[in-house]
């Protein structure tokens, strides 16, 4: 019964143990499930974050593009607007500046959001992807380690189970042995008790041995059981000890796993997860914070610009920007009628009483008006202050609308209901408009009153001065002298040329061969015109011109004329460009032959630009040389034009689109749509790499396109040559000495009066300013420099410093006298003059035309023609500047590239100044007496002021006098011949006619040389010119302005008109109004003047 109970207890213990082990196994499995679930939740989180940032990056990119489009929309809108021009001219108004900064901030935000998109896509999302990979990898590693730990833990529990069963078994055996031992002891005790009672009384003597053997058996059995018990007890003790030790170890292992190992296992799963995620989020925060910082920086710039909004500064900027519009005009001058010389208010006795009464009435009226106007001004100031208070109310703070709290909606609604409500807005607008209306009413009243006060005050002051009511201001300073009239510029038509081959719709090669023009006239002239006026024309060659004007220009070219040679005849740039395209489009044989079409198109397959350029060069080198010369000229021009693509919007590709169909015709059988893109690419390549494709001038002679062209038609005569001088052009390559650029001296002058220039070409200066003079642009103008700026300086507003006082005073008096009385000479002399500009025939009034006959060098410069076989002297100073250095006044402000250079030679302003200074003027002796006296004065002059101008200091006065005498004789003869032929009366000069007539007796006939071509007329034979007899490169001395003798002691009147800048005359090889004819010069001779002697001439 006891064993059965014991057996049940063993089963219960084992069942309880097994239940406990099963529970542990279940826990271990659930642990892995929990860790796996945690890992999956992290992966899902990371995946959601990646998707979120990917979508946010797309939104940021879309937002960036939207901002860029928004900014570009308005930027392109204002790029060609007036505000953009203001910005370029550094006249930026403060509101426009704020607008530009807002656009700039928009672009900045666009770039920042694009950067944010890049950070999200290439940084944050990549980091999250890496963290996801780390989570999966760490969970797998942790799971492997966890499984190993679970196996170890289960192994320990299995060992404990085994030891426990062993312990139970040995303990059961020990208990069994113990019970047997106790039973044996009881039998032994019972046996001893029986044997003790019977031994004395009952047992017989013969029964004692039998009882002794029974006792021995019991003792032996007891000993045996005792031994068995001891053995089982020892085994049970050992088993119990093992069981207890294993039990402690198992409990310790389970405790360690649950307390430490599970935590460490979770740490392994979390290894670096939070740190990596934190770095990722910090990257996101850094990007957002930097975006916010960038935004704040941009907003700070805008805020600074808003703080600098200044109406007064903008007002000054607008007035400075449009100074020609807002500057005060010239004062109205008294215009005497029919010789009336009284120019002041007369206060003689018949009108003195009336003037005095009028004076007192004005005085009373002015006092009343001033009081009334002062009250109006005070009211105006108060109204302005009220209006400013209304306009400067601080209603711009909307921070309440961005309060993120539960009461946000109530705050927003409260804000909207108070200030920005429709009722309040309407009320404030009504008050503002009412105040503005009152302000403008008072302003109008104030302006009208102040205008009236100004007019009455002027009358009052003049009457006060006339009536002698106050101290009369002493006239301590003189007024500026009258400036000369603007010389008239007259177009001289180009000589007609007749060719046997058509210019348009013909063969270009045949025309070039027939005409001798290396570049057809229409190509050269159109390109020159566009170079001067159209490089910045937006959409040139793409925007069509007027068809009527295109046809007109075309017809002129077909007649052999050049309609673009005269800059005064303004032509539409797009029409000129259309004529150029029309010429190439109408050629019988396209510029690129159809036979080479496939070869040129095949070059597009070459990806390497160098190989493509080389292949195109090999194809074009097979074309005729005349065609290559034209191609080289045209594509050099197109490349130059493309350099202004920022302004004209015509880059090489756009030009190729315009010129592709014109220059390359698609052969029959080819698909125009597919071929056109290839044609455009070929033309674009040639435009970009034209220097590498076409041969250089050394390899192929012919005209070369120059980026800097002169402003007029380039003929091969000197600026001072007369019509017909081209007949005597010497084509030999002589080496005559001529005035060099380095042999010219600069002249300093001091401003005698203030002068404000009316155009960019005229310099503005103050009285007493130091001026640097280059050369004489005309009778009345100098080319000079002031404050580092080159321009025109009026002669009568300055005092030349480095001249001899007596000579300059005498010469200036004569020049001033002639400038004032030139047109008022006797009618008989005037009737002999033509109705033409004084600048039309320079040689009519001086010997510059005769001495200006030149021989042309290969570089296009003018070399003075030798007058005698053995004369090697330099020409007199009357010789004009060479073709290389035309007058500076030729520059036209309509194009920044229209600079006065010929043949493309780019020189510094100093060299051009020094080159032109040597030709300060030409001398005109009206008769032989003046000639002889002038000759004697010039030959006896011993001044060495300009002794440093050259190294040729051994000239003999006799040889120079002989040269001058021959020149004077020729000039006088031609002058008389021209006067005999001219029969039309000269047009009167409106300005000079208003001056007082010259009181001296009429002198010889002479027109006023108001020309920038350096001609100075000397009518008085006593007024001679100084020159150095020791220099072969002497120049005209300059003049000091002096008042005419007839005006001595009299108060000078203000100038009747403001100074006018000289206009450069277009030089021409022939004159329609001249009596001296010359044969027509072909364009080839104009382009290559030394083609017969030197073939290296360039355009």
UniProtKB/Swiss-Prot annotation:
Disulfide bonds: none annotated. Residues 1026-1038, 1060-1074 have a biased composition (Low complexity). The record marks 542 as: Arginine finger. InterPro entries: AH/BAR_dom_sf, F_BAR, FCH_dom, Rho_GTPase_activation_prot, RhoGAP_dom, SH3-like_dom_sf, SH3_domain, SLIT-ROBO_RhoGAP. Highly expressed in adult and fetal brain. Expressed at low levels in kidney. Isoform 3 is expressed in the kidney but is absent in the brain. It is linked to A chromosomal aberration involving SRGAP3 is found in a patient with severe idiopathic intellectual disability. Translocation t(X;3)(p11.2;p25). GTPase-activating protein for RAC1 and perhaps Cdc42, but not for RhoA small GTPase. May attenuate RAC1 signaling in neurons. This is SLIT-ROBO Rho GTPase-activating protein 3. The gene is SRGAP3.
